[in-house]
Amino acid sequence: MARNLSTCLSPVVLASVVGACAAWVAPAVQAEQGRLIATGGASSIEGGAGGGIIPWAMLAGYDEQGEWGGNAFATHVDLPDYTLDVVGAAVSYGNRVEVSYAHQRFDLGSLVSKFNLPEDNLTQDIFGVKVRLFGDLIYDQLPQVSAGLEYKHQNDFLIPSLVGAKRDSDVEGYVTASRLFMGAAFGYNVVVNAGLRYSRANETGLLGFGGDRRDTRSVLKEGGAAILFNPHWAVGMDYREKPDNLSFAGESDWADFFVGWFPNKHVSVVLAYARLGEIATLDNQNGTYLSVQGSF
């Protein structure tokens, strides 16, 4: 999975899937009540608020100080040889702390017959916590900066162990910063995100953690940007760098290019083109990403 995707932003990162784009509505936009529409973000494939393939600094829901908020989501990624389905939910309190959960199912498709595999899918459970450290997406002089931890457990470790993975569960951390720049793109507002992840997950953990080539964590770059055309529509992209821990196959960086629709504070839909590159020896795994989220 050579990092040929590095140039594309984390294998399509599910085409900025994550609706990260939405999470950054212009401060000039009027909110229904409290926080602005879309500032709760979309849901990443690992459960936390942000873009499709990476977390951003915003938290799930539309809660303010002393309030609860959250969301539930379903995501489907259709690739030439695989499919990925994710369901999950996140709860936040006081726009300060977020707790999330995601269940991933990765159908192996043509890889099953190619290698006569004993299983036709891989599943993973992810439990996350994210804390807003300081700053604000819009109103503070400093960008909003958050830090998070994710505990991941791969539920079907036979195949990962056969290809060289060292463990079926692990903890990884990340720090991420997001900022909205008003009128920065021909008068349209722009949201920019940058982050670092400390991880040894193979294909985000679906192929276990660590490997015969490398069994230590790596510092990995993540980032994204979105243009907000109005309070309800955004387009953007995400990028996610990934490690190369397994000798049996390379691992591509991911990128995505997305369109996000946020009709109100309770519903969001993200459609993206995900460029995921090589996955488990099969190249050109680029396809469509669709995510639907309900928020409160």
Task: Describe each PLM feature range.
Residues 165-245, 253-254:
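Detector for outer-membrane/organellar transmembrane beta-barrel domains
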Residues 1-42:
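Cleavable N-terminal export/targeting peptides
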Residues 83-85, 103-105, 123-125, 171, ...:
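Transmembrane beta-barrel architecture of outer-membrane proteins
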Residues 109, 118-120, 153-168, 205-207, ...:
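Extracellular/periplasm-exposed beta-strand and loop segments of Gram-negative cell-envelope proteins
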Residues 108-113, 154-158, 201-205, 246-248, ...:
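Outer-membrane beta-barrel proteins
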Residues 31-157, 172-173, 178-184, 230-232, ...:
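Transmembrane beta-barrel domains of Gram-negative outer membranes and organellar outer membranes
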